[in-house]
Amino acid sequence: MLEAKSLRKATVPRSLLQHPSPGNVQSNRLALHVNDDNSSCWVYIASGCRIYKLEISMQDSLVNRGKESLLIPEQCEVMNSSLVNHCPHRSEIQSIALAETERSDCLILGSVDSYGHLIVSKLDNSGKDVDRLTFSALPRDCGVGEGGWAGICFSPSQWCMAAVARSFCKSIDVYDQDIHLQTIRTLWYPSSLCFMQTLCSGNDSSLLAVTEGCQLSIWDLRMKENGGCVHRICGSLGDIFYTVCSSSTNIAVGGADRTVTIYDPRRWSALSRWVHCSKYEITGLAFSSIDSDYVYVQGVDYEVLCGQWRDSKKVLSFRGDSNWLGFSKCANRDVLGGWCDSGSIFLADITKENYIQSTDGLSNGVPS
């Protein structure tokens, strides 16, 4: 079973950012990176046309629980904060994402604004300013028309490959660095996307999962027939999907029906449905990196919960203090971060229960 090692709450300094810009219902304006020594975590947040970074301690602390085992955060201070030396956008940033490269000392930061303008920069792994590598890409229509929600995701095997979704345009553009590879036309307004990590797709990351309206569509970037669409799954009519995520074996979707549905990509059949696990609409999902039988669920009502999707059993949860402006999970470990419009940042470090018990035993001189 998973347990929380720590849950911390920090506040964005007013001197750095006083009034964050409002975001879309999909909270994609936050990204996380834990330092190599696990002592602190860099939190990247986007507001308006700029990106900011904050360093928050990751030291273990006593986790307090309230009613119904709700985790109570411990107040902490922001260790460092600054404006990221990232080329500014011309319109409001809608989504940001971090990707790791072959080198262990650098990260890739990508951002996309409401017109689909993509900017990618290389960051120092220690949280220092941007390196010299920066490139940008515009959609084929040069971002004309009405702006709206836009999303970005990097390929897990090729950091240089990124997919950008634009809701109002019903399109997804795929890039290799600043080279436009192809455009996917969706039937409905896309609301979330991710490269699939399933075993059946191998390591080439050619499969892209997209939520559009009440449908989950699967696209093979190597195919031309049907525009590359290889499968469609329809949810409940009228219940919009807001989020999709993938593990090495399964894929999960959630949305307005407050239900997490897990699919087997080998047969495209539903393995499990965790019905009404959230009080309101689900706008964020992530499989646990420790045990993919667990899934993290973010709801509109400030709540974040973790549970076993096979048994529909909640094991832990915490709440923000206002609407989420950004929410994310680290790529290879169970560290969750959320940013509220009050300026509060919540940072949760999750691990296996037996790990906490073993470390407690060692600290008391008793072998586990």
Spans of features found by a protein language model:
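Canonical WD40 repeat/beta-propeller blade segments in eukaryotic WD-repeat proteins
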Residues: 24-34, 88-100, 140-154, 186-201, ...
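A common structural microfeature
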Residues: 27-29, 40-42, 48-51, 93, ...
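Short, flexible beta-strand-to-coil junctions
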Residues: 46-50, 112-116, 165-168, 212-213, ...
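Per-blade loop-tip surfaces of WD-repeat and WD-like beta-propellers in eukaryotic adaptors/scaffolds
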Residues: 57-64, 117-137, 167-192, 199-206, ...
